[in-house]
């Protein structure tokens, strides 16, 4: 009987810890944040609850974008730096990258881009060079989102142009 109670108690406490776990439980400032996030699964929680729970990390939700019916990108401020995370429909973090600083002069964007005058079929995220007043802006830093593998793929910015309409941050506005 004691063994049965011990096993039951062990299952209860293990399940309780699992239920409280989220994608930020392994994150530590000064450590490899993308590595700590990838493979974690987050429960559906209100953002303010997550931010309060992980206040020591300076956690702040910076916005999200639906990439496909099974994949979203979410920007988080963690330990004073911005990170972009790919999250699958079930809450699994499939990839994460440090996202570069952006501003009105170098705005963040997400969307379709062009190369050599032709539209590219993939979705790109990154930072643009906002110095020009043109509708298409050159890329400073970018990743292509591989929707099948749910991964960020770093791409060279040379020759890549993205529309001003893809700018999504208040610091870079239209």
What are these regions (language model features)?
Residues 20-174:
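Exposed acidic/polar residues on beta-strands and adjacent loops within beta-sheet cores, strongest
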């Amino acid at each position: 009987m004691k063994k049965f109670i011990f096993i039951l108690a062990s299952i209860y406490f293990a399940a309780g810890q699992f239920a409280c776990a989220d994608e930020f439980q392994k994150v530590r400032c000064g450590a490899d944040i993308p590595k700590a996030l990838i493979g974690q699964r987050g429960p559906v929680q209100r953002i303010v609850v997550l931010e309060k729970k992980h206040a020591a990390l300076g956690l702040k939700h910076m916005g999200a974008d639906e990439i496909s019916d099974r994949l979203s990108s979410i920007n988080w401020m963690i330990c004073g730096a911005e990170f972009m995370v790919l999250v699958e429909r079930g809450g699994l973090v499939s990839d994460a990258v440090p996202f570069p600083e952006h501003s009105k002069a170098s705005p963040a964007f997400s969307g379709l881009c062009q190369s050599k005058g032709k539209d590219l079929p993939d979705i790109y995220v990154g930072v643009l060079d906002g110095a020009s007043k043109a509708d298409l802006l050159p890329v400073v830093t970018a990743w292509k989102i591989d929707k099948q593998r749910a991964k960020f793929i770093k791409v060279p910015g040379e020759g890549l142009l993205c529309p001003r309409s893809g700018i999504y941050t208040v610091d870079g506005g239209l």
